Amino acid sequence: MTRVLALDHGAARCGAAVSDPSGTLATPLTTIARPDSPAGLEAIADLVRETGAELVVVGLPLTLRGQEGEQAAAARAFAGRVAKAAGVRVELHDERLTTSHARRTGGSAGEDERAAARILESWLELRRVKR
């Protein structure tokens, strides 16, 4: 498996986390301000290069009923911009309850970074189950 970068998209901030090369661990990485801006997208492209990520997973904020709303549409559009800016494949992954989980877990990393790590953990876990 290769490194995977996960992003917890928000209008003001975007948390980022990266996997280890074996796809076992998700580590909170950083928070990017204004991720939809040209500077924010360039910062994400830089993270992709620096980490050697070959795939980016963007959290898809579905409702508790599993439906898409305005935030999900924004995440889909953001994923397209990330793919173009970073030149890598981008997947969307259900992020329901990741922010509340990040709030409960605490730690030295910021809440957005922890939410991105939770998205990545969930994505990695799903891949292990499918094997």
What are these regions (language model features)?
Residues 2-7, 11-131:
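Phosphate- and other anionic-substrate recognition elements at nucleic-acid/protein interfaces
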